Amino acid sequence: MEEKYRQQPSNILKVVLFGPESTGKTTLSEQLARYYNTVWVPEYAREYLQDKWNDERKTCEPHDLLPIAEGQMRLENELTKKASKILICDTDLLETKVYSEAYYIGNCDPILEKYALENTYNLYLLTYIDIPWEADDLRDKPGEREEMFSYFKGTLEKYGKNFITLKGNKKTRLEKAINHIDQLLNK
């Protein structure tokens, strides 16, 4: 049953956009996929939680996290088969773990935590908070951006993840990301 949270084996390079809300992750995911002529994995939580908001006017609750994790991994595993040498992921289960802990007083479902730590990626692109925050139905922490960024960065450091921090405008971020991804592709 827990297999639905596990990555399928693959030889392609996997890159994750990682960071607080409204820091340009989706925009950069799309740009990188276009640049590398590959597919990108959207953030399943956005669709899931937008539907919940539209239907019930409710935001994320703890019982939503495992269905979100399952949907995210289903998308990633499906799109891995369609990717060409690199897969760009708008998020991963480690990000879901961070949000779980940030919103639910340090709590994270043990199943989510297990797979957040077991699933592997070649590079994390940590997006900084120097992009203006944009409101939508799901974003709710404009006053806590510095704290959230520190939490995301601390999580990558705690678990020894390979990451770089992206700051600046869209062009600068894209160029830095491409530079680091190319280094991995050329190894």
Regions from the language model: what does each represent?
Residues 17:
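Hydrophobic anchor at the beta1->P-loop junction of P-loop NTPases
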Residues 25:
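Conserved lysine of the Walker
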Residues 29-35, 65-84, 108-121:
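Short amphipathic alpha-helices and their capping/turn segments at secondary-structure boundaries
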Residues 56-93, 98, 102-103:
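Conserved nucleotide-sensing/catalytic segment adjacent to the nucleotide-binding pocket
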